[in-house]
A protein has these predicted regions:
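Positively charged, amphipathic and often flexible ligand-engagement surfaces
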Residues: 2-479
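ALDH superfamily catalytic-core signature
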Residues: 690-695, 717-718, 723, 731-877
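Generic beta-strand/beta-sheet core signal
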Residues: 156-158, 211-213, 250-254, 284-286, ...
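Conserved C-terminal structural/oligomerization subdomain of aldehyde/semialdehyde dehydrogenase
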Residues: 389-392, 434-443, 529-541, 545, ...
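Hydrophobic face of amphipathic alpha-helices that form TPR/SEL1-like repeat modules
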Residues: 439, 447-535
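Rossmann-like NAD(P) dinucleotide-binding subdomain of oxidoreductase/dehydrogenase enzymes
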Residues: 619-773
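Glycine-rich loop-to-alpha-helix module at the N-terminal edge of alpha/beta enzyme cores
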Residues: 531-623
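Residue-level signal for inorganic ion chemistry
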Residues: 514, 532-533, 553, 568, ...
Length: 894
């Protein structure tokens, strides 16, 4: 395989020299310190804490969770209380010193206050072991110290996770200020050979590292054009300022989800005439990504066309746990290598490829693994790569001894130096702590004096494509949502939307007894985001036609109830497969008929597929039944179909809930009539097409759109109805319960009602909450699909200490949402479903203005049923908007 061929080539050409250099580097990092340094190291409490956490996994988890929460806590009592709660977990084995610190009963007591002060100071000290400073003055001191040690730097501003446009604008301004301050300071520096001068060429004395997602709060691969426009507008300002001041800009790489769009934006921007000849720019690649080698090949080809070199910083990657968990949660292919050795091998392959193309690229080798750095040294020395085109990089606070050894060898070493306050720096700190305490960490293994021969051995991997396999085995696997970061998938989605728009305005007939029938009346289903756009005309059955459907269902039930469960289940599985095949088309129909943005529509289709497959598997499991025998008795427990099921589905989840209720009734042997909400009748017609194609027999399933007050009531009250499945408002649901309870002439059974009705959901934000996560989660829950879900966050209850800060960020984050037509990839929130809903929500907003304080209201576009995201503050529990379900984008902050 390719990986083995590359491995052999590296061994043959560079391995001997790599081993020699690596051995020397490790010996130098293990060199004995003088007695004072050894005493100082033994007394360092932060190293002791890391030793404790490494020895106890339970302590490590709880300690890192607590450290992550500290910046949000605003009093010593809160800190003491949280520390006690985290450290009292059963899995935690504490050293005696820490046990004494949590032995208090009152968080306000003197021992607790003392513990809190000690803990706070300790965490700050630990943080600034890895963070270069809290402000520019401290950072400049750090840079001066690095330069005296023969090293240079790149500065990274902590807190790049922006959730508002105000924060994105502030991020840009902070970098503009930073490079100006650093440039002023650099005027006092004398240029040093090796770090400021190489091969007779001056190297910028100022370098900063930036992340693209921080330049636009709505950065989204599904919206590449809009994201690129916003990001590039701000990047051009930064690049022009950097050119004016002579500063270098390096672009960091973030999560895999953003990688392709990040590379696309940079490749296009840096080909613009204004920036094409700039050589003081750089791009980062992460070797733990399976497609990173191909990315490097692509960058090499692009740089050749560009005609001017730039730097590629090669790192292994800092988000392995996050990438792995996200891929498992979404049932996507794992983007990162599962084995550390595979990452190390790929890093070596990429190092060789990068350095062997030094005529086109500058290489920055970022690693704390001595072997990785030694290989780079060996290749550079063998190929006689000019010093300007090659440098080593380490993280601030990590690999210090390695960096010093590399400087002694004559290499340029650049230290990646984050700076900022503790709160925005906490995520960075946790990543560093995880890296330092991981069993596979090279730094940890070297500190534990693992044999040199083992530390510098070549990485051995049987299969570079070895992926994580979930050991859980079930008869059901979730359908993965679409990953819109994939260009090919995104193009399919765009093409499907174009195709569906060409099919708008068609007529859809009811399906009764296997035949599509004519009706006297038709309903126009329109796009709520463009109310003049006809999605489809849907035939509305009469009461007489509803009776025909009941007769057909009753006749079909005789054979359907005897159909083996496996046969019924196979129809559902076929339906699920058809949904998967038509996923992008179905997404487009959902988007256009009910105003749901594409990713939300996609999640709904996944859920519908899951219903088909899960219920199929469950029915096969349940069919066998169970014996509950007693002495002298044979007792058989089994399920049998009830009869005719009437499904009344909602418009807010028009495909998922309609599918779930319908296929559950069908697979259990019941003949089913689907009466959808009027505003989502076309989507229900698409479900009908799928079930028919899947092989559902005539009369077993029937599509019966009609007026709820007539057809719906008739079906609910019909004597032959056995089961009613309903999702909708509490008012209608309660009426169905009441009507179903009435026995009709000739009715020999009691009806079963399965009703999911409205609700009033809330999110509680306490004083230890990560406000980045809390604000983003509330915005998504409250305004996703315009709040038209019973699960939407319509109330957020915030602890007093963080209330004002939370509200301010919540308002700014909501302001950053784009409201408009759901098929526009720039948009995060569409319209509400119809004019009736719009007018009802406006009435609630009017009441809210009378009772509470309006914190936010925005403008909306014309042409659809739009309601702006609306936030009220100062809401009391007895206020109308705090008590009643609004079913719209209205949020009460309490």
């Amino acid at each position: 395989m390719v990986a083995q061929a590359d491995r052999l080539e590296i061994d043959r050409r560079y391995e001997s020299q790599t081993q020699s250099i690596a051995g020397d580097l490790i010996k130098s990092t293990r060199a004995k310190n003088n007695i004072f340094n050894r005493m100082r190291d033994q007394m360092r409490w932060d190293d002791k804490v890391l030793e404790w956490t490494m020895a106890n996994p339970g302590l490590r988890v709880q300690m890192f969770r607590f450290i992550d929460a500290i910046p949000a806590l605003q009093s010593k009592a809160e800190i003491a209380n949280h520390f006690q709660q985290y450290m009292s977990a059963e899995a935690v084995e504490l050293p005696g010193a820490l046990k004494a610190m949590i032995n208090f009963s009152d968080p306000d007591s003197f021992p607790a206050q003392t513990a809190a002060a000690t803990i706070t100071k300790a965490v700050e000290t630990l943080a600034y072991k890895y963070i270069a400073g809290a402000n520019i003055t401290e950072v400049i001191k750090t840079i001066d110290r690095l330069r005296k040690s023969g090293m240079t730097y790149t500065i990274d501003l902590l807190g790049e996770a922006v959730i508002t446009e105000a924060e994105a604008a502030d991020y840009l301004q902070r970098y503009l200020d930073l490079i100006e301050q650093l440039t002023q300071k650099a005027q006092s520096w004398q240029r040093q050979e090796g770090i400021d001068l190489a091969d007779g060429e001056e190297i910028s004395q100022v370098q900063v590292s930036v992340k693209l997602t921080a330049f636009y709060s709505q950065f989204d691969p599904l919206n590449p054009v809009g994201s690129k426009e916003k990001v590039c507008d701000r990047l051009r300002i930064l690049l022009r300022k950097a050119a004016e001041l002579g500063a270098a800009i390096h672009f960091d790489m973030e999560q895999y989800h953003y990688k392709d769009l990040t590379l696309q934006i940079l490749k296009e921007l840096l080909m613009e005439a204004e920036f094409r000849s700039r050589t003081d720019l750089g791009i980062t690649l992460q070797a733990y990504l399976r497609d990173s080698y191909q990315d490097l090949q692509g960058i090499i080809n692009w740089v050749k066309k560009r005609g001017h070199p730039l730097t590629v910083r090669l790192v292994k990657g800092a988000y392995w746990d996050q990438e792995t968990i996200k891929s498992l949660q979404n049932h996507w292919s794992q983007p990162v290598y599962n084995q550390k050795a595979a990452t190390d091998l790929n890093y070596e392959r990429m190092t060789q490829l990068l350095l062997e193309n030094h005529e086109h690229l500058y290489a920055a080798i970022g690693s704390h693994n001595v072997r990785s750095q030694a290989l780079a040294c060996a290749i550079a020395e063998t190929l006689k790569i000019p010093p300007r085109r090659f440098e080593m990089q380490v993280l601030y606070g990590m690999g210090d001894k390695l960096a010093q050894s590399l400087v002694k060898r004559g290499h340029r070493v650049r230290v990646y130096s984050p700076y900022g306050n503790l709160l925005p720096g906490m995520a960075y700190l946790i990543r560093r702590l995880l890296e330092n305490t991981a069993n596979s960490s090279f730094i940890r293994q070297n500190d534990e004096a693992k044999p040199i021969s083992e530390l510098i051995a070549p990485p051995m991997v049987d299969d570079l494509d070895d992926r994580y396999i979930d050991s859980t085995t079930t008869s059901f696997n979730y359908a993965p949502d679409t990953d819109y970061a994939n260009l090919e998938t995104r193009l399919k989605a765009e093409q499907a939307l174009v195709q569906v728009k060409q099919e708008l305005g068609k007529t859809y007939q009811p399906l009764i007894n296997g035949e599509y029938i004519e009706t006297a009346n038709y309903l126009d289903s329109v796009n709520p985001c463009r109310s003049s756009e006809l999605v489809g005309k849907v035939g509305q059955i009469s009461v007489e036609q509803a009776e025909q459907a009941m007769i057909a269902a009753k006749a079909a039930f005789k054979s359907w109830k005897k159909t083996p469960a496996t046969a019924r289940a196979n129809i559902l599985r076929k339906a699920g497969d058809l949904m998967e095949q038509r996923r992008h088309e179905l997404n487009a129909w959902i988007c256009l008929e009910v105003g749901k943005i594409i990713p939300q529509a996609d999640g709904e289709v996944s859920e519908a597929i899951d219903f088909c497959r899960y219920y199929a598997a469950e029915m096969e499991r349940l069919e066998s039944g169970k014996n509950y025998d007693l002495a002298g008795e044979n007792n058989r427990y089994f399920y049998q179909p009830k009869g005719i099921a009437v499904v009344i589905s909602p418009w807010n989840f028009p495909f998922a809930i309609a599918t779930g209720m319908t296929v559950a009734a069908l697979v259990t042997g019941n003949c089913t009539l689907l009466k959808p909400a009027a505003t989502s009748s076309v989507i229900a017609a698409k479900l009908t097409e799928i079930l028919v194609e899947a092989g559902i027999p005539p009369g077993v399933f029937q599509y019966v759109p009609g007026k709820g007050s007539e057809v719906g009531t008739y079906l609910v009250e019909h004597k032959d109805t056995h089961v009613i499945a309903f999702t909708g408002s509490r008012e209608v649901g309660c009426k169905i319960y009441a009507d179903a309870a009435q026995l009709k002439p000739g009715q020999k059974h009691l009806k079963r009602v399965i009703a999911e009705m409205g609700g009033k959901n809330a999110i509680i934000v306490d004083e230890s909450a990560d406000l980045d996560q809390a604000v983003a989660g509330v915005v998504q829950s409250a305004f996703g699909y315009s709040g038209q879900k019973c699960s939407a966050c319509s109330r957020v209850i915030v602890a007093a200490p963080v209330h004002n800060a939370f509200l301010a960020r919540l308002v700014e984050a909501t302001k950053s949402l784009n409201v408009g037509a759901a098929d526009d990839p720039n948009v995060q929130m569409g319209s509400v479903i119809d004019a009736v809903a719009r007018d009802r929500i406006l009435e609630y907003i009017a009441q809210g203005k009378q009772q509470s304080e309006l914190a936010l209201s925005m403008s909306t576009p014309d042409g659809g049923y739009y309601i702006p995201p609306t936030i009220f503050s100062g809401v009391n529990p007895d206020h109308t908007i705090a008590q009643e379900e609004i079913f719209g984008p209205v949020l009460a902050v309490m």
